[in-house]
């Protein structure tokens, strides 16, 4: 009998300490006031990732509150079109289109929320990285995202077209710092427990050990 073993992606969870100096330098470089909330998009700027949906979300949320900075970090085929579209948004002064930032740790650390509006996904590293920093994720319920995020426990899942729902949830979370912190702590705990590189290594070695044991017994 053939057996398939699934092993989760793992990330380094040892670099989750807040870089206070780095945060302030980053905010200064990109003109982000300390009294602003921050929601980020991190990933490729390509059609299947739906970065245009992030713009739609930003415009809707801006109608409700103007204290949010929207960060987009990444490169891709839609860069020029997105830059042009942002220039015509009411919230254009609140946008920061940064290009690729590597490592993106500092972006997660300054952000209150990460939004993943994709039409299709596997198990994206940006979600694991964001959660490891205690930054809650709002995401389309597609691909492997439901394998990482438990809705309303350590993140939030939505139908991919439900921008209104994402907007309402983001507004609620930004108004409830205690609940936002609770979700963030749950996120960080889940990554440490289930998605660390150490756990991935242990599980991989266990599979190899089992295979070697079976082969030695013929």
Name these PLM-found stretches.
Residues 197-218:
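C-terminal alpha-helical cap of glycosyltransferases
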Residues 1-21:
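Donor nucleotide-sugar binding/catalytic pocket of nucleotide-sugar-dependent glycosyltransferases
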Residues 37, 41-60, 77-83, 125, ...:
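A conserved mid-protein helix/loop that constitutes part of the nucleotide-sugar donor-binding site
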Residues 136-139, 149:
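Short hydrophobic beta-strand element within catalytic cores of glycosyltransferases
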Residues 17-32:
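A short helix/loop element that forms part of the nucleotide-sugar donor recognition site in Leloir-type
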Residues 100, 119:
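Aromatic "clamp/platform" in nucleotide-sugar-dependent glycosyltransferases that forms part
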Residues 28, 165, 172, 179-194, ...:
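A short, well-ordered alpha-helix in the C-terminal region of glycosyltransferases
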Residues 151-152, 156-163, 172-177:
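Conserved acidic donor-binding segment of nucleotide-sugar-dependent glycosyltransferases
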